[in-house]
């Protein structure tokens, strides 16, 4: 066993003394059992994580029952909704790297035989997956689950995205103060990740198709008995996988990454999943070309439109058959998935999901009646984004295939929000927000406030927004993010000027500023070099080491320093 490194031999008597002091070893034979880490992310200020202490206790009991010894440790967590719109958002994406580093540190320092990961919200899930790829110790994931959708006094279904858009609607005067406060009180009624197909739930669904979690991980409610039983079953399966030495890198292959993007296309997931899945591929040693994502989009139908793109919540998806029903439907179209891959269940993706039929065709459409013949995400290329950009086409009004309007440029999120709120931004604009990428932000903050204000003011079909920053999973509208290279790295988005004509072509997947190359070249000659905004602390180190969005925004030490 891997843990023999810390518990076998006379020279490890001091380590054994410390292990006895933890109280985790209940009998003399316990030292001969596998040691299992429970990597938890319980935190009081994140509603998606307030219940995870209880879930960890269930996991501990089941791990003991299965014949192993559990040891729990905790990671940090950032609630993107609470951190939104201020300096706190600069820490959100960088927290992913801290989580990965922290988990790697504890797992490798103590030579655990296996790891039971309990994530839930936006950066915690991918951070833990990065750690699993890095350490490559037998592992299983069981998330905390989504919250119930809210309900307004008028019977309208609510999610957190409803609340963000309500801010713009209230400023516009289209809803009353009473309605506004009612929504605030009822948008998030229980613990769990936010109820729509936002980043947290997107990643928790993708873990099912990646093969790292049990079926229904992405949709079973946080408050359900099914969630608690899933924790128990996952614990039993992990101990079995430790004995069989089934490791994360055996499961997460290039084909698994393909299938993760295919499910994302079918469910119209968050654009952040592109960033995180590319980072996972990078950590797994898989060279993954962005063009591959568009090829997947072309062959994958869009089957389930979930909030913020509709009024359906994750619970509605669960009742309609969950991710297994979507996977089963996709498997009926040859070449869409790679169903004979091994998963954490010890069975193939096909064996896990075959025969799981759709129970509600309004929530999950069948292959012969998709929302769209192609997937809900697209990678755009062009002279603004030579290394790619991402748009959630599933969140764009279906009537819009191309959009050509005049640029109005801002060098920060805050400048753009002020201009939208004071009506400087009008119908016919393409809002350009730059110097908000991984280096520029720093931390690639989410642009939910400006996109929500645009939609809330009724301009969702008349104003586009492009940025080297990123979006919340709650974003909808004509919103292009992750533009690479970013402005801080000298990317062409830095060369756009007010009044330039910009074309977003969703059919041909292009993003261009309609200026001759010689004009752009002259502008580049006068471009002021970027200077880091933060000089001290973690964000300064992050700025120095982070890469562009097209590689997942991972931190890499320059080769000349290794």
From Swiss-Prot:
Catalytic site positions: 472
Residues that coordinate or bind Mg(2+): 80, 122-123, 446
InterPro entries associated with the record: Dihydro-acid_dehy_C, DihydroxyA_deHydtase, DiOHA_6PGluconate_deHydtase_CS, ILV_EDD_C, ILV_EDD_N, IlvD/EDD_N
N6-carboxylysine PTM positions: 123
Record-annotated disulphide pairs: none
Cofactors demanded by this protein: [2Fe-2S] cluster; Mg(2+)
Keyword Ribonucleoprotein: no
Keywords recorded for this protein, A-Z: 2Fe-2S, Amino-acid biosynthesis, Branched-chain amino acid biosynthesis, Iron, Iron-sulfur, Lyase, Magnesium, Metal-binding
Function: Functions in the biosynthesis of branched-chain amino acids. Catalyzes the dehydration of (2R,3R)-2,3-dihydroxy-3-methylpentanoate (2,3-dihydroxy-3-methylvalerate) into 2-oxo-3-methylpentanoate (2-oxo-3-methylvalerate) and of (2R)-2,3-dihydroxy-3-methylbutanoate (2,3-dihydroxyisovalerate) into 2-oxo-3-methylbutanoate (2-oxoisovalerate), the penultimate precursor to L-isoleucine and L-valine, respectively.
Family label: Belongs to the IlvD/Edd family.
Protein name: Dihydroxy-acid dehydratase
Lineage, opening ranks: Bacteria, Bacillati, Bacillota, Bacilli, Bacillales
């Amino acid at each position: 066993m891997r843990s023999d490194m810390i518990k076998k031999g006379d020279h490890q008597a001091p380590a054994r003394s410390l292990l006895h002091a933890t109280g985790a070893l209940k009998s003399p034979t316990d030292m001969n059992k596998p040691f299992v880490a429970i990597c938890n992310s319980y935190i009081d200020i994140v509603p998606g994580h307030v219940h995870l202490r209880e879930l960890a206790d269930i996991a501990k009991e089941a791990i003991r029952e299965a014949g192993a010894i559990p040891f729990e440790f905790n990671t940090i967590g950032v609630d993107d909704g609470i951190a939104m719109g201020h300096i706190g958002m600069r820490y959100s994406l960088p927290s992913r790297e801290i989580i990965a580093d922290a988990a790697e540190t504890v797992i490798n320092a103590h030579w655990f035989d296996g790891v039971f990961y309990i994530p839930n919200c936006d950066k915690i899930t991918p951070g833990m997956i990065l750690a699993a790829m890095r350490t490559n110790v037998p592992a299983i994931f069981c998330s905390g689950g989504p919250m119930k959708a809210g309900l307004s006094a008028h019977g309208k279904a609510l999610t957190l995205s409803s609340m963000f858009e309500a801010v713009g609607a209230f400023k516009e005067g289209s809803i009353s103060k009473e309605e506004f406060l009612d929504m605030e009180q009822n948008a998030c009624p229980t613990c769990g990740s936010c109820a729509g197909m936002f980043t947290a739930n997107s990643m928790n669904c993708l873990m099912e198709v990646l093969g790292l979690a049990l079926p229904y991980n992405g949709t079973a409610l946080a408050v359900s008995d099914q969630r608690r039983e899933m924790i128990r079953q996952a614990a039993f399966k992990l101990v079995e996988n430790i004995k069989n030495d089934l490791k994360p890198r055996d499961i997460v292959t290039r084909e698994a990454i393909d299938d993760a993007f295919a499910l994302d296309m079918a469910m119209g997931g968050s654009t952040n999943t592109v960033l995180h899945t590319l980072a996972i591929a990078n950590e797994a040693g898989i060279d993954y070309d962005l063009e591959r994502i568009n090829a997947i989009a072309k062959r994958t139908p869009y089957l389930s439109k979930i909030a913020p793109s509709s009024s359906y919540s994750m619970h509605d998806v669960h009742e309609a058959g969950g991710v297994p029903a979507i996977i089963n439907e996709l498997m009926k179209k040859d070449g869409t998935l790679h169903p004979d891959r091994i998963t954490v269940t010890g069975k193939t993706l096909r064996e896990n999901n075959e025969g799981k039929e759709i129970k509600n065709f309004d929530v999950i459409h069948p292959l012969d009646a998709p929302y769209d013949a192609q997937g809900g995400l697209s990678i755009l290329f062009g002279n603004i984004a030579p290394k790619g950009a991402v748009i959630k086409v599933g969140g764009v009004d279906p009537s819009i295939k191309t959009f050509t309007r005049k640029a109005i440029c801002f060098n920060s999120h805050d400048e753009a929000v002020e201009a939208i709120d004071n009506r400087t931004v009008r119908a016919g604009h393409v809002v350009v927000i730059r110097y908000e990428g991984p280096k520029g932000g720093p931390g690639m903050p989410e642009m939910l406030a400006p996109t929500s204000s645009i939609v809330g003011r009724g301009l969702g079909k008349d104003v586009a927004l492009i940025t080297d920053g990123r979006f919340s999973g709650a974003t909808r509208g004509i919103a292009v993010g992750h533009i690479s290279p970013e402005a801080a790295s000298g990317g062409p988005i830095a060369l756009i000027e007010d009044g330039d004509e910009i074309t977003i072509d969703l059919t041909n997947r292009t993003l261009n500023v309609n200026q001759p190359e010689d004009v752009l070249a002259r502008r580049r000659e006068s471009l002021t070099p970027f200077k880091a905004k933060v000089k001290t602390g973690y964000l300064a180190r992050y700025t120095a080491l982070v890469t562009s969005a097209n590689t997942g925004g991972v931190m890499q030490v320059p080769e000349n320093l290794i």
